[in-house]
Structures are given as C-alpha cells and as structure tokens.
UniProtKB/Swiss-Prot annotation:
The keyword Transport applies. This is DUF724 domain-containing protein 3. Residues 384-402 have a biased composition (Basic and acidic residues). Residues 376-464 are annotated as: Disordered. Homodimer. Keywords: Coiled coil, Growth regulation, Transport. It comes from Arabidopsis thaliana.
Amino acid sequence: MELQTMKITKDCVVEVSSEEEGFEGAWFRAVLEENPGNSSRRKLRVRYSTLLDMDGSSPLIEHIEQRFIRPVPPEENQQKDVVLEEGLLVDADHKDGWWTGVVVKKMEDDNYLVYFDLPPDIIQFERKQLRTHLIWTGGTWIQPEIEESNKSMFSPGTMVEVFSAKEAVWSPAMVVKETDVDDKKKFIVKDCNRYLSCNGDEARPTNIVNSRRVRPIPPPSSVDKYALLESVETFSGLGWHKGQVRKILSENRYTVRLEATQQESTIRHSDLRPFMVWEDGVWYNDLKQKPIKETPPTILKRKPMRSCSAAKSMTPTSATKHLRSFLNSKEISETPTKAKFVSATRELGKNKADAVMNDKTHLLITPQETSIAPVITVTPLKQQDAETEGKKSPKKTPEPVKHQNGLENSSTQHEMPEEENSNEKSRKRKREQNQNSNLNETDETCNVSKAGVNGTSDTIRVDDVDDQPLSSWINIPTVLSSDQSSNVVDNSAADVEETQAKGALTIEPFTKNLPFWKTYEMEKGYKTVPQNPHFSPLLEFKEDIREWSAVGMMVSFYGLLEEVKKLQLDVSSSKLGSLSTCFAELEKHGFDIATPQSRINKVLSLQVGRAKKVEERKCLEKRIEAEEIEMQKFEHEMVEVERKMLELKRRAEVAKEKKEAADKMIVEMKSSAETIDQEIANVELEFITSVLAPW
C-alpha cells in the first residue's frame, strides 16, 4: 500500500531514528535546521523536540545521516477509525518517541497489547497512543502487510501461570516470547497481577523459565461449595498456593491449610478454586490425591520370631498388625467403657501394664497404678477386613494373644507344674532372670502345650486399656524355655505384688550398662530440658545395638536442641522441615519435643510474616518507582518550562533594548522637531521685521 509522496526541507518537522543500542526501532520528533544537499552522505543538523542535552537545559542537537531522517507520517494513520488488527505493525507513543511493535491482542476499554522485539517485551497501550506503522522509502510511504499471528497455545500475549519451586506458588504471568536456550524450549514471561493486566507497567521484569514451569490458566471454577479435606488452591500474595480444606465456616469461608507451610488461614470462597493438574496438554482433576491422614494410634511392632509348636501359631508382628487393623477399622464392639488407645510413644513412659495369667482365668490386662485397678477381661477378636497398602486382605482369625508372647491361655483349665508352689526367694530369682531376658527374641521354638492352643472358642473383651505396645502389656519374656514356662504365672503375680509395694516401674528394651547414663544427667542441657524416653521402638533392633542406638538418640536430641536455639530468621524452610522431621522421629521414642517444636513453628510463623512484609515492601518499591518515573516527567516539564522562560526572558531583554533604542530615537527626533520649530519661528520673525521696516 503506497501513500502520497512527501519532501523534507529546512525548518520542517521530521522524525529521526538511530542504530544506537536500546534505541533500535524508535523514531523521535525533531526540527530540520538545514536543507538536504545533493549528497546523501552529508549529515544534517537536527534539533530534537522531546530529547534534551546532557545538562537538560536545552533541546538536544545532533548531526544525523540522511538515511535516518524521514518526514512525519500522515495523521490519517493515527485516527481512531483505523482498525488495529492482531498482527498489525504499529508505532507506540512510548518514552518520548514512537516505538515499532506488533499488536498481539485487543483488550477491554479499547486497549491493546503490543509486542516489542528489542528487548522482548509486551506493554499495554490505549488506542490514542498507537498509530499504524509506515515505511518511508524512495520518497513514498508504504504500509507493510499484516503479519500472520501465532495461534499456538503459548503465543505472545497469552495469559499463563508460572510455578515458583521456592515458594510453591503458581503466579499469573504473560507469555512474551517462546525461545530456545541450549536446545531447550523456554519462555520469556512477564509477571502480571491477578486480574490479568499489566497496566502498561513497563517496569515489570521479564523472566526466562523452563517450559515445564508454565501452564495455561485453569478453566473457570463452577464449584458452589468445597468439601472437607478437599484439595484446593487459594490465592495469596502473588499467586495460587495448594492447600486443603480443614474446616467449613459460615458466610462462604473456609479454614485452609497450606501444603507448603502447614499454616492455616481463613479464606473466602471467591479466593479458592479446585486443585487441578496440567499434564500432557490436558487438565486433570486431582483424583489421585490422598487426604491428609491423622496420625493413627501407634502399636509397637516386633520382629517375627520362630513359631511355637502349637496349631496355627502366629508371630507377634502379624498379631500386632491384625489387632491394629481391627482397632483402626472401628469395628470393636462398644461397651459402657470404651477401649481407648492413645499413642504408645507418648504414654509408655508414663504408664505400665502388668498381665497376670493363671490356669483358671483369661488373659488379664490392668492399667499400672499404685493399687491394682479393676481387672478387665479380654477375649479374642475375630479379624475383620483391613486394608493394607490400598488392598483388602482376606478375613483371618488371629490366634490368641498368648502366642505373641509364648504363653498359654485357654478357656479350659490347665494345671501348672509343681514349681508353682516354690518359695518366695526362688520366685524372685526366677523373676529377675525373666526380666533380664524380657523382650529378647531368639530363633528357638517355644514348647507350648497343645492344650493351651485351642483358642477358637476364646473371646477377648477390652473395656478400658491404656494404649501400650503388646510387649509392655505383658511384662514377661518374649520367648520362654520349657523350664521357664511353668513359672510364668507365679512370676507375673509376683510382679504385681512387687508393683503394689514399689509403684510403677519403667520398662526399657535394654539394660543401662554404659557410663554415659551416669554422666549425661550432669550436663547443662539435660538439667535445662530433662528427658525420660522409653525407647520402645528399639525392640525391633538387635539387643546388642539397642543401648548404643539410645545413646545416639540422646546425643542427637540435645544436639538438635542446640541447633534450634541458634536458629536465625533467615534459615531455609528445608532446614526447619528437617529439624521438625528429626524431632518427630525422636518423639516416637518418648522424647518430649513440645518446646523445640513450638520454637520451630514460631520461626516458620515469623518467616511467613516477614515474607508478607517483604512483599509489601516490594509493592511499595514498585509504587515508588512509578512515582519516580512520574516525577521525572514533571522534572522534564519543568526543564522545558524553564527553557521557555529563559527564551521569553531573552526575548524580553531584546524587546527592552529595542524599546529603549526606540525611546532614544523618539527623544532625538523630538529634539530635532523643537529645533526646527525654533528655526521656523525665527524665519517668521525675520519676515515680519523685513515687512515692517521703513522704506
């Protein structure tokens, strides 16, 4: 498309471009101060209309090659009735000049997104700030053809979300350009606000991100109400954070726990959306998510041991799993006093349960107190359906609890050997032997009489039992020899008698033989934060390493405690998470971690608060930067006004000089006029004298 031919002459307004870095593709208004010559190589003197010299007091004057000078494009290409299509080359009024770009999208309120190639950027402009781009060649204006727009999913101007691994947040952004870096597909993106507007803020930075960190904007949400424990995304700060609904409140509000920080906040429905996954170009609902599970009651596990020589023997581990599965399935028959299981890791250090068995009663479980609590009768449970690792196991009837400890417990009476009536000294000596061998697992088979195995008709009733591992409920050896099995009942009964006399005893899976136990209590750390862990999970370890493992845990606890004391506010979240995980592991062994854990949570809370303040500071900095830009514009206006004032002052001085010269001339002419008047009067007087003279 060709337009009319135009010429440039001295004192006409022209536009000047430059090859200087940072100014490519820009045209600045100027006044041509000399006529073009016959030689095109001759540089012409121009005075810029919008650019000032270094001191800012006067317009910038340069000598420019003629190939960088052109006339001002016709005003028709800037009229509002000119349609600006996507892909059209335009000039944008920006930074005191006209910069060439491409229209990539028409926005609301007659605004347009324009893409610039050097440097890659997209800025929003009003219609009045744009004009169609024309090329000046051979003394004629030519309008280039419309470029074919990129219709890909991530074309320039497309709104997307960019993932920040550090903050675990999806932030709104705009695709500026798709590029290849080291043969890898990447995107240049520009941060935008939540409402998908850059507001013409060219100060917003552009970033190069990996394609895997970019996804489209999720489809609009049509959810009227979110369910409890549903995975959602909540908008906070500069993006969307993954979380889980923990409470449903009134007035369309929810308590949401953020996955990254584990902090809970009250969020309105309008600031939530369903959690979705972008994979292989398709949006998926989070169907594979696993709800956050509350920590189930823990029951101490034991390593498998050799089965007893009785029908359908069962290892302690499998029996423990069956019992735990049954309790977790909530299928225990409720009685006036429910069996309440609490975490063994928290209660084992505080309570001890003794089991007393004889040939006429079932397995007896009593909470450990100074005085014996009412006896609670326990009957075997039938194994119900329990899910293990997402699959249901077939129904199975567990063996009586006696098999887990190598003991007999039958509904039929069974006579014990004559050693049952041995003297008190013998019982105490054997009890000491049993306690020393307690919880030690061997590969030997236990010789349990078949009369005690017929437990199919036995029933177990649990009324009120403190949550204790099975090994701590029955304070007897894990594996008994044939000689020891005959004295089990007497020894257990003697334990109860001794407990009544001496109070509760602490059950530990090892004997404290190392000198460490005598010295560490004198340490400053122990005196400040004393600990009395039970170390019950060490029952899964071999006996030779239990005590050393316990020593390591004690040293680790106080070492971690020192790290918590020295925490700084700028510590990484991964470090805090690691400390929290370590303390959680130590808690399983009976350590009291409430104080260090609360301090870690406090540091996390302070970090979140500081992050919010930092974000507020960044917003203020952006506002300050915008105000500074505005202030610079005012300064330029003031400089221009001052320049004009100086010009007017100079002109006033010139006018004053001319006025003074004119006044002087007038005075001189008036003086001359008076002289002439006097001469005329003299002539008239001489005439009269001559006429009146006598003849």
